[in-house]
Amino acid sequence: GEDPFDYSYIWEKMYRRTHAWGRRGLGMVAISAIDIALWDIMGKITNKPVFKLLGGRTKEKIPVYASKLYSQPIKDLQKEAESYVKQGFKMFKMRFGWGPKDGPEGMKKNIELAEAVREVIGYDTDLMMECYMGWNLDYTKRMIPKLVKFNPRWLEEPVIADDIHGYAELNNMNAIPISGGEHE
């Protein structure tokens, strides 16, 4: 029974009511789903796309990156990277498949993945590296010096989202920009 154009009021009302069970996880997912639905309703009522409701275009072009370079046999990974290069991508995100439980051999495999991708895309492109919270602080601190030579634009979510001190310590190493917060 609320007016969808009162979206800020509705959002704050929902957010305040999550205090008892925490402001993370499913509660925030539910708020996000309702928020998206409100914007969609407002767009339908006004017959405008949501980006116009949010203030309109701010740039002529938006940079995008190829984001599916998963751990796989090296030849397949390189073939996939080549297809992205042919499509004109200049930014790429790869994902590591090995972590602390895989020991030195896993580290070696991660380095081989980075080498294989860089071999195809070259160094005049951006390479982002995704860990999907699969590493711990110690493993990440040992991997970073091995990854610096690949000139990554960032290392994404090396440790779990709640490890604020770990993120701070990695950031203070100042070797590779650290990205996180997607799974907060």
Regions found by a protein language model. Give the residues of each.
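Active-site nucleophile and cofactor-binding loops and adjacent substrate-binding regions
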Residues: V29-I31, G181-E184
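Metal- or metallocofactor-binding catalytic centers and their adjacent structured scaffolds
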Residues: G1-I45
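Residue-level recognition of hydrophobic positions within alpha-helical transmembrane segments
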Residues: I31, I36, P152-R153, I178
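Ligand/cofactor pocket segment of small-molecule handling proteins
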Residues: M173-I178, E182-H183
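Metal-dependent enolase-superfamily TIM-barrel catalytic cores that perform enediolate-based chemistry
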Residues: K61-M173
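Glycine-rich, aromatic-flanked loop segments that form ligand/cofactor-binding clefts
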Residues: L26, D35-S71
